[in-house]
Amino acid sequence: MSVEVFYDDDADLGLIQGRTVAVIGYGSQGHAHALSLRDSGVDVVIGLPAGSKSRPKAEEQGLRVRTPAEAAAEADIIMILAPDTAQRALYTESIAPHLAAGKALFFGHGFNIRYGLIQPPADVDVAMVAPKGPGHLVRRQYVDGKGVPCLVAVEQDASGNAFGLALAYAKAIGGTRAGAIRTTFTEETETDLFGEQAVLCGGAAALVQTGFEVLTEAGYAPEVAYFECLHELKLIVDLMYEGGIARMRYSISDTAEYGDLSRGPRVIDSQVKERMRAILGEIRSGEFAREWVAEDEAGRPNFAKWRAESAAHPIEETGSKLRGMMSWVDRPITETA
């Protein structure tokens, strides 16, 4: 591999076991990090607002819960796992006043550091540990003695051993069992945003909706169009997930593969690639970040409008009816057992 990958033998858990880690936030990633850190012998404190609905859950699981400011004051390492748009105010109000020299500030995503929304003092370590999987999977793999690969990066090395500390954190949540890949805040942030916007969320959703529209506008039944453009997407993605595009093409019919190879490049052509490059350019220049921060500060008017418009798309009503015929989709995909 062209990247550096680190495993259990490369990480010293002792670097983190003698310290207190504050996990700020207790959502999907927060609960997985906190419980796995605790089970790895790390002293953990959860930082949540007094009225947070997650407080009882964290306390029921045997974790100490304090306000974000109290947790930050107590901790040697502060991991911020709150939503991107909440982090700047959270940092300014609750963390910065307690960020003494020698402490470490960790992130699960590089957005606020990459775009300068948070600017830590020079005398603290700034690092990132970002598992490449949802929190429930991170926790399940840890409990099973396995792990989820993660990205590890250092933006500021005040101590001289920030990367070693980040690797220790990754090991404590099971990441080095599978492999911790060294990256940078810039690379993680820019590729993550691009994947979300152009491929995984924006690109895929737009492709599915447009395909549904083409079929229904041509007179085909919405139910049949739903199956062909949305429902069966999972079958294809699962094959790609398990063994790449080659595995998918090996598993489908020759007719499907010929259509894939001969027609796919006509759908995603050089013009689409140029528009994808333009989207990447907006991410790299900071244009997207500035737009999103301004949208959030303005109360998210465009976001709310676009969300409502998408929710009203005919594919949603059709899908809701058809999923009533599918007993196997009653169980939430995030439910683990």
Curated annotation (Swiss-Prot):
Protein name as annotated: Ketol-acid reductoisomerase (NADP(+))
Annotated Mg(2+) 2 binding sites: D192, E228, E232
Organism from which the protein derives: Salinispora arenicola (strain CNS-205)
Protein's GO biological process: isoleucine biosynthetic process; L-valine biosynthetic process
Residue sites binding NADP(+) per the record: Y26, G27, S28, Q29, S52, S54, D84, T85, A86, Q87, G135
GO terms, molecular function: ketol-acid reductoisomerase activity; magnesium ion binding; NADP binding
Residue numbers binding Mg(2+) 1: D192, E196
Gene: ilvC
Positions bound to substrate: S253
Catalytic activity as recorded in UniProt: (2R)-2,3-dihydroxy-3-methylbutanoate + NADP(+) = (2S)-2-acetolactate + NADPH + H(+); (2R,3R)-2,3-dihydroxy-3-methylpentanoate + NADP(+) = (S)-2-ethyl-2-hydroxy-3-oxobutanoate + NADPH + H(+)
Catalytic residues (UniProt): H109
Pfam families assigned: KARI_C, KARI_N
Protein family (similarity comment): Belongs to the ketol-acid reductoisomerase family.
GO cellular component, one term: cytosol
Enzyme class name: oxidoreductase
